[in-house]
Amino acid sequence: MLLLIFGKDSRLKYFLGALIAVAVILFIINIVDLNRYVVRSVAIYDSKIKKRLKVCFVSDLHNYACTPKFYEDIREYAPDVILCGGDTLTATKGRKQDRAYAFLKELSKIAPVYSALGNHEYRAMIYPEVYGSLYDEFLSKVKEYGINLLSDDSVYFEENNIKVTGINIDRYFYKRFKVFKMEDGYIESLAGKLEEDKYNVLLAHNPDYFEYYNAYGSDLILSGHVHGGLIRLPLLQG
């Protein structure tokens, strides 16, 4: 129950009213953002890149039914490879994942697909007693559609001198409202020793640990998880 008690001071009343109005507006904006996508094009130049590679990065579809325009936009971009940041599934016991698999199938028709795991796939993998055969089913579809899974694994595009690595940080690091300390060498234990002569791309689902990914030395870090980005609040560190 929410109980608001107003006294004679109308300033408090106006302040609380304004606060509620701002909260409602932010909530509406959040709902809208969660149900749309924005296409951003970024050009990266680096002396280690031998030849241009057009990459499309998508993440956190969560068993969503994509519109034809979504796929048209990707086809129009004509990527050489497609990178997935994870959470193609929504790990809910007994829930059908048909739309997630349709998404992977359509992507595989456009370009070679390389996918990391998100926390939902990772959860399905480590808790089969909860999610049953969900992860095995996911692996079966990945194999059927020729998706390349980067689960603490890498792929090297020799012609471009670009190495892409996907890592799975422990479930412990996905606890809400808390960022934990990672031990020295933890990212290297997942990704392997950094090859500094290559252009290194790291697929790391949770962006909260950017400082650790960056310390590892990757040239480019691609994350998902936060569904619309992070907002830094001044003075509050949140």
Residue locations for each model-derived region?
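N-terminal membrane-anchoring alpha-helices
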Residues: 1-49
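Membrane-embedded segments
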Residues: 51-148
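Structural motif
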Residues: 53, 80-81, 162-163, 199-201, ...
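Conserved beta-sheet core of the metallophosphoesterase superfamily
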Residues: 144, 201, 206-238
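Catalytic metal-binding/acid-base residues of hydrolase active sites
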Residues: 62, 88-89, 120-121, 154-155, ...
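Binuclear metal-dependent hydrolase catalytic cores centered on His/Asp/Glu-rich metal-binding motifs
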Residues: 125-146, 154, 158-200, 210-211
